Amino acid sequence: MPKSGAIVYAHRHISKDPLISKAIALYDGHMSYYVNSLKAANSNYAYPTLGSTFAIHAETYAQVRGYPKRNAGEDFHLLNKIAKTSRIQYSTETTIGLEARLSNRVPIGTGPSIKKILDIIEKDPSGQSYLSYNPLLFKFLARALKEICSFARAPCQFDEIIGSKLDELGFQKIASTLHSHYRSSDQRQENLDQWFDALKTLRFLHKAESHYPKQSLLGTLRVLPRKERESIVSKNPKLSELLSNF
C-alpha cells in the first residue's frame, strides 16, 4: 500500500448462471474498454470505480472526509475526490473475484446494469446488440484535453464543437478568470485538471454522443488493435467466447 492515495485492483465477476455470466462479461468488457480508452486519451481519471476492489490509505480517507452520502455512485465520487489530492494506482497484478448479482438497491451501478443487459441478450443471445462508447468519442476527448492543455499555457480558440461542449459544462466561468488568478501555466493546468474531473469527463462524453453515437461493444472490440483487445478480454473468457462467435 502506498503512503497516500488509493489502489484500485483488477476484478472479474463470477456467476454459475449462464445468462448472468454472459451479461456480466459484457458489462466488465464495457468497463475495461472505458478505462483503457480514457488512458489512451491521456485522461487523469483512467481507473475503475468499483468500490469492492479498491483500498484507500487512512490519511487520504480522512483528508477527503470519507464516503459521500449518496444514493448511488459513492465509489465513483470518492475516487474522484481522491484523484484530485493524491495518487490513484491501478494494479492488475491481483484480480479480485466478485459474485455477480442482480440488485434494485440503487438506480445506477453494477446490479441495474446487469439487469438491462439481461433484457438485451434475452432478445439477442449473441450479445451484439449491447452498445458501448464509440471509439471516435475518445479521440474527440483526447483532442479536447490537448486544447485544454494549450489554453492553460495561453488563451486560445477552441474547436467549435469542443468549445460548445465545454461551455455546456460551465467552462466559461473558470476560463474568464484563469489567467488573471494564476500566473504560471502549471498552476493553471492543475486548476483545469481538477475542474475537468472524472464526472465532467463522463458528462462531456455523454454530450458528445450526439456526434459519435454508441455502437456494438463486440463490434468495437473486434476491430481494436490486438494488444488493446487482449488487455480487455484476456481475463474475461466469456467475453472472448462471445467475440469468437461474432
Which positions does each model-derived feature cover?
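Short, well-ordered alpha-helical scaffold segment located
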Residues: 59-60, 95
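Acidic donor-binding loop at a coil-to-helix junction in glycosyltransferase catalytic cores
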Residues: 70-77
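PAPS-dependent sulfotransferase catalytic core
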Residues: 94-124
